[in-house]
């Protein structure tokens, strides 16, 4: 399994036979070297969106159209993109599971907001979500944009993820201290990878508080386009 950060909240996850592009915002992303776009999307099989905000869905339609990939996500968002842009899609909802080239992806709750920019302004695109991605003997919890929530209790107990990809930059999501608290209280991670940080000055620039709050857990600060092999 390989997990590669695309900057901000974007990831390339190679698991089983799937290559998932999670929240691929590349164009205009100050963390992403746009000259390496082809490398980042090569071989992708699916695009997985946590919600509609432009810093998560920004390049989804362009990549889906270019490579002929389905966009996978909450039903409201996916059907809207299908109607507007003619892309392929797999829409489902919280509690549902889809199998994507051997990887089992279950949609779980998050607490944030979700809209996408339409011609007349923001369009509501269903609720925000996270994902449990299972394969190769591991379960990855990709939190999406969220704060701490009580639902993390049953999510951790039921799905038992060993890898956490946690939005932890503060301001729009939980910060590093809150993410560490959530991980300690609700999960038993072996590895935690922070995201949604370093992109803009108002977000946290370091994961040191996360590391200090999770003794005994491997906290990996990702570098853009440098694969993490699990």
Swiss-Prot record:
The keyword DNA-binding does not apply. Pfam families: Lactamase_B_2. Transmembrane segments: none annotated. Keywords: Hydrolase. InterPro entries: Metallo-B-lactamas, RibonucZ/Hydroxyglut_hydro, UPF0173, UPF0173_UPF0282_UlaG_hydrolase. It comes from the Bacteria. SUPFAM superfamilies: Metallo-hydrolase/oxidoreductase. One of its GO terms (molecular function) is hydrolase activity. Belongs to the UPF0173 family. This is UPF0173 metal-dependent hydrolase Rsph17025_2229.
């Amino acid at each position: 399994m390989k997990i590669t950060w695309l900057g901000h909240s974007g990831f390339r996850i190679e698991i089983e036979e799937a290559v998932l592009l999670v929240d691929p915002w590349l164009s205009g992303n100050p963390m992403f070297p746009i000259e390496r776009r082809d490398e980042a999307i090569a071989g992708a099989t699916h695009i997985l969106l946590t919600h509609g905000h432009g810093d998560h869905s920004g390049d989804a339609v362009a990549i889906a159209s270019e490579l002929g990939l389905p966009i996978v996500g909450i039903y409201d968002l996916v059907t809207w993109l299908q109607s507007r842009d003619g892309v392929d899609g797999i829409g489902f909802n919280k509690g549902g599971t889809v199998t994507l080239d051997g990887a089992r992806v279950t949609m779980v709750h998050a607490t944030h907001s979700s809209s996408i920019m339409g011609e007349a302004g923001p369009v509501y695109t269903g609720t925000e979500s996270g994902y449990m991605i299972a394969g190769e003997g591991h379960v990855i919890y990709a939190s999406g944009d969220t704060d701490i929530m009580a639902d993390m209790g049953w999510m951790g107990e039921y799905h038992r993820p060993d890898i956490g990809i946690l939005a932890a930059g503060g301001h729009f999501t939980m910060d590093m201290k809150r993410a560490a608290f959530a991980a300690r209280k609700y999960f038993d991670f072996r590895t935690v990878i922070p995201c949604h940080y370093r992109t803009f000055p108002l977000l946290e620039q370091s994961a040191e508080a996360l590391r200090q709050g999770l003794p005994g857990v491997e906290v990996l600060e990702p570098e853009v386009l440098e694969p993490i092999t699990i």
